[in-house]
Structures are given as structure tokens and as C-alpha cells.
Amino acid sequence: MFRLENMEQVVSLAGLLHDFGKFTNRSSNYVENIKNKEYKTFKHPVLSKEFVCFLEENNIIESSELLENLKELVLKHHESDIFSKVNLSVKNIENEKLQRIGNIIASSDNYSASERRDEPVEYNKENINWMTKPLNPIFETISLKNDVNENKTSNFAYKLNTLNYEAIFSKQLTKETNKDSFKGNREEELYKHICNFFEEIKKIDSNSYDIFFSQLYLLMEKYMWCIASDTQINISDISLFDHLKSTSALALASYKYHKENNILENGAQPSAEIEQFKVLIGDVSGIQNFIYDGIKSEGAAKTLRGKSFFVKMVSDAIALYIIKEFDLSLTNIILTAGGKFYILLQNTEDSIKK
């Protein structure tokens, strides 16, 4: 069991867990099992807070004032009054400073979900069950002729599974389920998937925040990579994990920007007009020469794989070192591939100097 030590940890976790309830509310069986608890509603923000309480009840996170702040930020993370009847918007946070931090979480959620669109979203017209609608691949919306019809529906989707090399290939959506196709997620599969996640979470035993965050992050990726973030649109091709990861990265970088510029202490509200973020791009040079130099025909494939793996490990190690120096989290590493890495930073003078 570990204890939260600072608001940076709270903000990073709040971003990662704010929409966790969109994972558990996909199963009516799961929701039914917790209805004995005294909640006025079982909307996804309430289920997100329920997960934080689960971590506390299972002695994974120690009770503290910071943990109570985390519960409040996860519960009230919407700018709009979409849940006004049950007081789940940011403006319902009573503590003024915490409310300003709540606005950072809400803004980061909006940035990640692209909720501020110039054009209205075309919502699902086929009355597909939002609870069982699977994640669609992005490939059907790729076009070299720029003639993608945004109102079309997807013919392929990912089957519900933990992340593995076989599961990453999408299946055709049909009226019947067989080896090469299926008609969508099923309630019993969703419930089992969620229960398996919770069983693995219970095994986390660490007195270190960093170790806990890494384990939580990897388990969320393992189970939520195939869960669609938004199931109200025709093609749901953004996973819940990717939305939560990017929200966490944006929230932490934004919080550090506002904190280092004393914006929160001065009582000012976070603003979308200021440039809060920087993207650091790194490139490990000389990769091609390193990989192909001295390659012999015998055992060439094994040597190439080994050298490619080494390059990946080097770029990962550099990225991890950088986020440690900037006091950021795993979520701030946007991508590491091909000897390159992309990291989301706060746009501050201190960051630029580093």
C-alpha cells in the first residue's frame, strides 16, 4: 500500500481514471452488483469514483486528504451540465483551488476527446447498443483520395480480448459469430473481461507510487485497448485506453504549466488561449548503420531482430529518463518507435532551459 504524496500524482491519476466508469458501465451485470451501494446514479463518473474507492478498500492506496481530492476530481470532471441533476460537474466542487484543478482535468478531457468541434458529430443512427458496440479499426477511414464518408458505418471491429499479437487483427462484423467474424461484444464476455481486470488489480502490492502507476497503466492497456471510448458515433475507432492516457498526459503537463507560472495560486482559471504544451521529439541517430553493419547471411534475421530490439530499448530508456527529469508520468510518452520518441511537456521556461 502506498500514500499519495503530492497534487501532481493526484492530477495524473485523475486524468487516467476520470472515464474509468466507461469501462465498467458497459456491463449491466457489473452495475447491478454494486446497486446495493448508496449512489443516486450509476453514470460513468460515479463508477470512476467507485474504482478509486475499490483501490482504497483493497489497501492499494492509503486513505488521505489527497485521495479524497482524487475522488472529487474523478467524480466531477465535466465542464458542461450534462449531469446537472446529480451535481457531477466541475462547478460543484466546493473547494475553489480544487475546482480550478478540476477545470484542468475537464479541459484535458475535452482536448483528448476533441469535443470542441467545428462541425456537429454524426451520431449513431443504427440504434446499436452502446454498451456492446466494439472498437472499430482506423483503416476504413483512411483514403488517399480524401473522400471518406464520415456517416458510413464500419464493417470491421476488434473482438473483446486482452492485448496480444492475435487479438490486434480486426474481424468482420456480421449477423452471426464464427472464427473470422462476429456481431459485437456480448454481455457475458464484457462482465468476465471486467472481472478479470479487477482480479489482476487486486494483486498490485507496492509502497511506491511509480510502481503502482506503471502496473495500473499496463493493466489498463491490457484490458481497455479494445474498448471504444465513444460508442455514440457511427465509427468508434479511438480506444478508451488511448483517451485516458492522453487525458492524463495533458492534465499533468497543463497542471505543471499553471503551477510553475503561479496561475492557480493567483486565483485565475485555466485558459485554452495560452500555449501550455511543448512536444519534445528525439531521434537516435545512426540506426541504419548500426542495424545493418556487419550482418552476415547466416543468422541474419535473428541478428536484425536483436539489434532492432536494442534500438527500441535505448529509445525507451532515454524517454523514461526524460520524463523522470521533468517529473512527468508514463502517459506523457506519446510514442517510441524506430529510434524516435515523442514526449508531451509543459511549455515553461524551466522546460525550455532543460
What does each model-found stretch correspond to?
Residues 1-150, 157-163, 272, 292-304:
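Divalent metal-dependent catalytic cores for phosphoryl transfer on phosphate-bearing substrates
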Residues 1-52, 156-160, 167-233, 237-259:
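Acidic/His-rich, divalent-metal-binding segments that scaffold phosphate/diphosphate chemistry
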Residues 275-277:
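Conserved catalytic motifs of the protein kinase core domain
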Residues 280-289:
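Catalytic-site or vestigial catalytic-site microsegments of nucleotide-handling domains
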Residues 298-326:
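Surface-exposed, low-hydrophobicity interaction/linker segments
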Residues 319-343:
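Conserved helix-loop-beta segment at the catalytic/binding core of cyclic-nucleotide signaling proteins
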Residues 345-353:
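Helix N-cap motif at beta-to-alpha junctions
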